[in-house]
Amino acid sequence: MRKITTAEALAAQIQDGATIAISGNGGGMVEADHILAAIEARFLQTGHPRDLTLIHSLGIGDRDCKGTNRFAHAEMLKRIIAGHFTWSPKMQALVKNNTIEAYCFPGGVIQALLREIGAGRPGLFTHVG
């Protein structure tokens, strides 16, 4: 069964404390920014969702306001697990000021871990971290 929904309806389903994994190619390419914008808009209007954990393996953003910059609100984001923060200056500021928990792992390790989680396997051992 195929189900099509709006970005706003999708954003409304995200609960406080949720973990969200996003993907893209960095530099504002191949990113579902319309959905990310709807999540941010909901937070700015209602204060929810809050205390999120955000996971991404590649830098996602445009060095301005898109991508992970949309999650760069202290109350919205509790922690980020990422390959790097190059494309998100607002996220860099939260990390630099210890406003949120931040973990930086190799992008390939994050991608492999997400694959293992999606397959229902227990985890991942790697030589690099």
Residue ranges and their predicted role:
Residues 1-129:
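Conserved alpha/beta enzyme-core scaffold
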